């Protein structure tokens, strides 16, 4: 029996992607309001508890922050077991992290079939983007949701959890009644840049998918 005020609804979400894409920063931004400027390879797994208040009551996400380093690959099945949803993250300033997205997706769906998955391109506050909206096709081919995000500016930070909450609860009218407490942005996301990215994504969504069998 949950204590009074404790969320009755909770979900396990696994956060995966290459090392250095900002997964741990993503979580710590929510929970402690700290942005990690120094990259420290995550050892093992940390479970972060994140509560969102919605018009359907509080929802708790138990976020498993998995190691992005391949040397920990043997442990990943254990991370994935009983996951109810997932976030795959890549770094828009690093093409290789996007090229590795299909591998993360394959590992994930091998253990967890038919769970809602969000693909996130992090670090969009950096103007020198290497991965643009038009070539980001993987989510369309695999029917995943996609968001540009930025830890440093808080841009779109709650969007992945908002989309997952609606999917998991099965209510398209679910709304957050309070935003999570985040630290003040370290940088300001240029509104014109954000508008351009959103426009580019909209255009990309209406572009026909290429015929080739390339995963990306």
Swiss-Prot record:
Tissue-specific expression: Testis specific.
Please give the residue ranges the record annotates as the region Switch-I: 37-45
A single GO cellular-component term from the record reads: nucleus
Pfam families under this entry? Ras
Give me the reactions it catalyses: GTP + H2O = GDP + phosphate + H(+)
* Highest taxon of the lineage: Eukaryota
Which keywords does this chain's UniProt record carry? Acetylation, GTP-binding, Hydrolase, Isopeptide bond, Nucleotide-binding, Nucleus, Phosphoprotein, Protein transport, Transport, Ubl conjugation
NCBIfam families for this protein: small_GTP
Q: Which family does it belong to?
A: Belongs to the small GTPase superfamily. Ran family.
Summarizing the function annotation, the protein's role is: GTP-binding protein involved in nucleocytoplasmic transport. Required for the import of protein into the nucleus and also for RNA export. Involved in chromatin condensation and control of cell cycle.
This protein is called what? GTP-binding nuclear protein Ran, testis-specific isoform
